[in-house]
Amino acid sequence: MQYSEIMIRYGELSTKGKNRMRFINKLRNNISDVLSIYAQVKVTADRDRAHAYLNGADYTAVAESLKQVFGIQNFSPVYKVEKSVEVLKSSVQEIMRDIYKEGMTFKISSKRSDHNFELDSRELNQTLGGAVFEAIPNVQVQMKSPDINLQVEIREEAAYLSYETIRGAGGLPVGTSGKGMLMLSGGIDSPVAGYLALKRGVDIEAVHFASPPYTSPGALKKAQDLTRKLTKFGGNIQFIEVPFTEIQEEIKAKAPEAYLMTLTRRFMMRITDRIREVRNGLVIINGESLGQVASQTLESMKAINAVTNTPIIRPVVTMDKLEIIDIAQEIDTFDISIQPFEDCCTIFAPDRPKTNPKIKNAEQYEARMDVEGLVERAVAGIMITEITPQAEKDEVDDLIDNLL
């Protein structure tokens, strides 16, 4: 027998009252995006559960994808069979022969939404339980916490059988908590920050600063690959590439070395905030971890934050590096993050950056530059790409292939 569909149960949606259907519709769309790599799979959702109809797709691969989608409490693979007692009996026997091992206990849990079916739930439990005893005479029944709980559901159109419940990712459907701009470098921390924001339902757009020729096409592709890894948790993500070369050269020419990192981060924050405003975001998200590097002291954060009143979410701010690495490995971003491509935060990094920068000093150095013009030109030059779970070969890939 082959699975016909996957029955999906919701996570925290039960607490959402009148907004429940909005959350469900968002989750359905997210599941559809994530499963778009399986062309034959179709997704539907109602108030109580969602269904992914396999239509011949490989169940194992689809299940692995579903495990990552935020908003799913658990799911069960389902067999669809003809709605007749004899077919149900033979199907139950076939399933039990496949999965039963010596010493296992079982029970049958039946329910019916089709009340015209010839047996009620109690009678169906007894009839199908008897069929199991015919197939496996020594099997034991256990009503509480059996090894096998074979669930039977009689609906209008057919009967459905399942015995396995697989834990989902939990959390909230991506997009139900509003939009945030993720400052995505190519490092370990920012993808983890993005993942944690996604888990709480934030629809992220990835803002990446590129400084060609100082940063390479490989660095850009690395950031896009990290973004693609994050799409498996809630669907497509907008990747926003910001041209940053002019600003970095201006900072390098007109500011003391100790303040290069502070000013660089202040410009990044301004630009991200401007993009957020244009694209109707609510917050900025970054991968800062307190004390990990010079730009992540409380004094530095204060000096950098001073350019915006927008809330800054720092999901990894209290984590040790090893804790962040553990999550990066779990979500499969670590190996990409450690690829040896320079990002724009490292190319002009000073040997001894200021760890307690003063806002008034930063403002004094910025007065030497056309801050507003630099920001406006950077925002005007952004390039937006929709990143999907399935990689598509593009010009950057071709260029990398040629270089290699």
UniProtKB/Swiss-Prot annotation:
Compartment(s) where it occurs, according to its Swiss-Prot or TrEMBL record: Cytoplasm
Entry GO MF terms: ATP binding; CCA tRNA nucleotidyltransferase activity; tRNA binding; tRNA-uracil-4 sulfurtransferase activity
UniProt keyword Repeat, yes or no: no
CDD domains membership: PPase_ThiI, THUMP_ThiI
Pathway: Cofactor biosynthesis; thiamine diphosphate biosynthesis
Alphabetical GO biological process terms: thiamine biosynthetic process; thiamine diphosphate biosynthetic process; thiazole biosynthetic process; tRNA 4-thiouridine biosynthesis
Gene3D superfamilies to which the protein is assigned, alphabetical: 3.30.2130.30, HUPs
Domain named THUMP: residues: 60-165
Recorded catalytic activity of this chain's protein: [ThiI sulfur-carrier protein]-S-sulfanyl-L-cysteine + a uridine in tRNA + 2 reduced [2Fe-2S]-[ferredoxin] + ATP + H(+) = [ThiI sulfur-carrier protein]-L-cysteine + a 4-thiouridine in tRNA + 2 oxidized [2Fe-2S]-[ferredoxin] + AMP + diphosphate; [ThiS sulfur-carrier protein]-C-terminal Gly-Gly-AMP + S-sulfanyl-L-cysteinyl-[cysteine desulfurase] + AH2 = [ThiS sulfur-carrier protein]-C-terminal-Gly-aminoethanethioate + L-cysteinyl-[cysteine desulfurase] + A + AMP + 2 H(+)
UniProt record similarity statement: Belongs to the ThiI family.
Role according to the record: Catalyzes the ATP-dependent transfer of a sulfur to tRNA to produce 4-thiouridine in position 8 of tRNAs, which functions as a near-UV photosensor. Also catalyzes the transfer of sulfur to the sulfur carrier protein ThiS, forming ThiS-thiocarboxylate. This is a step in the synthesis of thiazole, in the thiamine biosynthesis pathway. The sulfur is donated as persulfide by IscS.
Protein's name according to its UniProt entry: Probable tRNA sulfurtransferase
